[in-house]
Amino acid sequence: MFGTESSLSMFLNTLTPKFYVALTGTSSLISGLILIFEWWYFRKYGTSFIEQVSVSHLRPLLGGVDNNSSNNSNSSNGDSDSNRQSVSECKVWRNPLNLFRGAEYNRYTWVTGREPLTYYDMNLSAQDHQTFFTCDSDHLRPADAIMQKAWRERNPQARISAAHEALEINEIRSRVEVPLIASSTIWEIKLLPKCATAYILLAEEEATTIAEAEKLFKQALKAGDGCYRRSQQLQHHGSQYEAQHRRDTNVLVYIKRRLAMCARRLGRTREAVKMMRDLMKEFPLLSMFNIHENLLEALLELQAYADVQAVLAKYDDISLPKSATICYTAALLKARAVSDKFSPEAASRRGLSTAEMNAVEAIHRAVEFNPHVPKYLLEMKSLILPPEHILKRGDSEAIAYAFFHLAHWKRVEGALNLLHCTWEGTFRMIPYPLEKGHLFYPYPICTETADRELLPSFHEVSVYPKKELPFFILFTAGLCSFTAMLALLTHQFPELMGVFAKAFLSTLFAPLNFVMEKVESILPSSLWHQLTRI
């Protein structure tokens, strides 16, 4: 025992200050690299790498989780409803107010050099186009067969070329000989029906202005309306005709909706409202396009608040899916009744009136549904062009809503002031939003990951609830700073730090030496001698 202690003391005495400098410097470097990796992993995936490895891999090895236990199966059965709800809330929806690629998105790229749409977003749009604009019988018509391939094409120029090719095929005239007299014949010219989906693609992607897009959509409307009427008469003749009629219906609804949006962009708002109302009456079951959200935005532009309230009364129902447009428009109407006279100082003195309480509750309801919107309405975060798809309750939906509705909030005097004074009070009602909500289901945890796929990389995705730094990042940062400080002090004051290091090690081993001395005093010397030899 005494030999071991003396050899340890000799080893410590032979260590030079350079050794301590090298030791602390190496420790600081390693902990710094770990810190950088942990921070990068946390920013990209939202969790600590060390914590994830510990929970996912080390804990099962240490026996912390029993995968075969009955408790696990019971808990999984009990959580099935919440899991299904989480999956439904993380569904990606088509943005009803999406912009035009050629006339709006591409112009932004030409000016800034940035791509406003992600590959994931455009791929979802390609899938939507194949679902809405194609059917199994397209191979029977050459133009539709070309367009079926065009919707799958990734290269924009290749898609545009395919659309022109489809239109050129339809320009081919079939000539039929009709004998009039034995010595002469004439040719009857017969035009093939136009390809409506080709005009749609050109209007969306090739037209560089809204006016050009509107002209192409009007040509698409002529072709699409004819195809719709023909397939409507034949839809009961078999499943193939029924699928073709369903496709033609989707094409016609899409064209009319985009024409209404063109009219809205060009300032013909009343005309746009009429087109949207007619479309909703003609096709009341096609709720997938969410045309009522386009109608709400146009009515707000006209300041027709009574009509807005009538639309909300129909669609702001407990049985229907909610959206930021529904919730925040309802809050705007409630705020409009009191916002011009609202004062935080007066409200704190006399309390809130019934109308003010209703407005505050409507704002809290809207903020609970989508907590990202107020930062854009209050211009605490800069807006970008909205994506073609949104995630309800996510940052993408907040951008899409604020991009079109910020002007409507500014137009109502005092509405933004009321929002500024009350929106943060929502979070006091739901301290644990991922576990339990107040008026809605708990906030889905999948929004951040999906929004990072939908939104461009130059945009900083808004995260809710704000994540705290994991313990391992804080621990690594402290360890890195501490070892770096030790290395610096050892380099500047080598002799003094050597004395401190020896004193620290002596203090560290003092309890062990005390225990060993007690053991030596209790055990016989002969037995202790035998144990040390072993």
Swiss-Prot record:
Entries under CDD domains matching the protein: ST7 (cd11557)
This protein's UniProt keywords: Membrane, Phosphoprotein, Transmembrane, Transmembrane helix
Membrane spanning residue stretches: 19-39, 469-489, 496-516
InterPro entries, alphabetized: ST7
Keyword Nucleotide-binding: no
One CC-aspect GO term: membrane
Compartments in which it is found: Membrane
Membrane topology qualifier: Multi-pass membrane protein
Pfam hit, one: ST7
Main location: membrane
Domain of life from the UniProt record: Eukaryota
Residue(s) carrying Phosphoserine: 343
Region Disordered, annotated ranges: 66-85
Start-end of Low complexity biased regions: 66-80
PANTHER family: SUPPRESSION OF TUMORIGENICITY 7, SUPPRESSOR OF TUMORIGENICITY 7 PROTEIN
Family the UniProt entry places it in: Belongs to the ST7 family.
Protein known as: Suppressor of tumorigenicity 7 protein
Gene: ST7
